[in-house]
Amino acid sequence: MALMVNAKGGNGGKEWDDGFDYEGVTKIHVRAGSEGIQFIKFDYVKVGKTIDGPIHGVSGLGMTQTFEINHLQKEYLVSIEGYYDKSTGVIQSIQFKTNVKTSDMMGFNKGTKFSLGIIRNKIIGFHGFSDKNVYSLGAYFIKVLATKSGMQGGQNTGKSYDYGGDYDGIRKVYVTYDGTSIRHMRVDYDKAGQVECYEYGDKTGTQYKITVNYPYECITSVEGSYANTQPYGCIVLRSLTFKTSNGRTLVIGTVTGTKFLLESKGNAIVGFHGRVGSCVDSIGAYYAPFSPSPPPTQKLEGQGGDGGDSWDDGAFLNVKKVYIGQGSNGIVAVKFEYENDASEVVVGDEHGKTTLLGYEVFELDYPNEYITSLEGCHDKVMGAETGVITMLRFKTNKRTSPPFGLEAGVNFVLQKESHKITGFHGKSSTMLHQIGVHVVPITE
């Protein structure tokens, strides 16, 4: 039975539902206009035949972009990301990801971000709301069965072990190495948020461990080697190297004999099987689609006065530049440059009003540097009915910026331990009255 995920995006439009009586999606048509996404259309696969879906929205001026999914080559849609305008409710841009590739961002990547995706699932149908534009999208998901690889190493010795075909991901792997051979393995699996542990072999030697930051990270490949080894008189594993989606690596043992690689592009390793005796004789993998969940965003309350209009840039992948405009009595304007998940630069709106002095710029050494805290001051100054921000100072994982403005009034700090700042919100008029931040856990 398909799982229905509620529509994400803005409010507005009339409800539509393509249903879920399909095997998958094979083609997507999107047209963007000046107000955002004008229409969207999906072609589905049912009993091996293409089903032409209806248009949702209105076909106006603009260029239609298409994204094809080769279902004949076992390609399928796993997730969607996009942005919508909170004021109009219209989706501004959208991007699709399969187990093989990712589409271009269709439309303009501005506004509030949304996403649709479930680990180990694929999208087979859509529903949502539209009128003259597309306001929101929801999807139907079904679980994708893991694919089992062949075994690498000894094929007939020892006894069989087989775990992971029904698990969502891997949280930890422990490997024991005695200086010659891989003797023992323990794997902590995740199943619907619960951890299940399995181990096999003889725990003799030095134990190594890799902790996977699931669901934000996965194991993407395992390299290794095997050889006929004494005193066991059979083929056993001599080395293993685990690699993750975050670029981390754990190397165990010395490459000896026949080398192998367990990897499936676009998929994560979610389990292992093989044979084991006094040593781990062989190893194989289970592969499944994996779209790392974005770290949960937390909005920290703004600090300062209550004047001006509210604004919110939202949360992004990281901050690249900070622009600060100063006046005679405090900070008059700020603007931020971000990078989104599609590695595209997003320049935020100006909040406040700059003077002839223009902006000072604090540029980060992205992607190696990120903001960990924001310090500042606010005070009630001449010419302002409510408090204004008088000083801002940014701390990163590498350094501290100079203070921008005057340290006068009430001090404040915006930070959360083991988190980084990825977006800003606040209140402004012709001055900056209040500022707050969006933070996410540090996963690097």
UniProtKB/Swiss-Prot annotation:
Question: Which is an annotated GO molecular function term of this record?
Answer: carbohydrate binding
Give the family per the record.
Belongs to the jacalin lectin family.
Boundaries of each Jacalin-type lectin domain copy?
A: 2-143, 146-289, 297-441
Source organism (scientific name): Arabidopsis thaliana
According to the UniProt entry, which residues carry N-acetylalanine? 2
Q: Name one GO cellular component term.
A: plasmodesma
PROSITE patterns noted in UniProt? JACALIN_LECTIN
Q: What is this protein called?
A: Jacalin-related lectin 41
Q: Read off the InterPro entries from this record.
A: Jacalin-like_lectin_dom, Jacalin-like_lectin_dom_plant, Jacalin-like_lectin_dom_sf
Q: What is the lineage of its organism?
A: Eukaryota, Viridiplantae, Streptophyta, Embryophyta, Tracheophyta
Q: Does the keyword Repeat apply?
A: yes
What is one Pfam family matched by this protein? Jacalin
* Record gene name: JAL41
Q: Which UniProt keywords apply?
A: Acetylation, Lectin, Repeat
